[in-house]
């Protein structure tokens, strides 16, 4: 075996994709010292997406001062690549859940304003191409905060300017984009998301994700009503119907809320990464792909990171073995086309024990070593 590609997603809550790949690489080097190993950090639009891109593209990291979800000053960073032409921005760095203590989370009051400030900073530096990863947000403002930071105004029925927070979506009566940053006209945005939820409704942004952002049942209904109302206002002003667009409900409606006002497109995060980093070219000459994530289950089959990796492996006729901290729906995963689906736990443990970073890395190393030892016996 001459070439193995390591394309691991993060084991969420335990170990990031980079450290997982390092543990796997160590095991392979010990068993197959002459094997070429290519580490390929992976994410699906959620946490780690921009980190994976910045790492692989050797991005220049820049910092700027913006506002957090409650409009408090915060310092953030993002990546610049392609000789300053492209900015890679993680939405969560300015308005992510980890920025707010769990007992203070309230998507009625939070805003994406800081993300718009990051974009404005990148525009000043000359960037005109953007990749924005929109997973892990603490917001449900449909992106009006970001747009306000870029010059848009959202007015109520009395022409009063609204604060760009979730509870005010229901009050939006007019949208004024006459002062939108002129550099946006020559800019393009790729919005990388990891979900396909519509803008509103039972499967929409508020009902599915607002509870984990701190909303109670009444607030969920209010937020959903706000999204319904705002979608109608957008349709009246732009003639674009975002109501049932797949992915429009990502990041509290930001997925759909940006499309009518920016030169933007929604893409699966894994597709963005695989295309941007030319994963297919890397895989074409490989003998094996090792991949994995914290939990392998039915979600794995639904357009997430490993699904994208598997599709490339099948196209290039390269076997794909998936490792998971926990494995459910093994038969469904096998039917997807994985060569093998393996749990890394050597014996029953509590979830808390299983999530310990060192334990996870040891288990990855041990499992990869066993996989490689089996392969060695059949490739002599």
Regions found by a protein language model. Give the residues of each.
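N-terminal loops that bind phosphate or other acidic moieties
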Residues: 2-134, 138-380
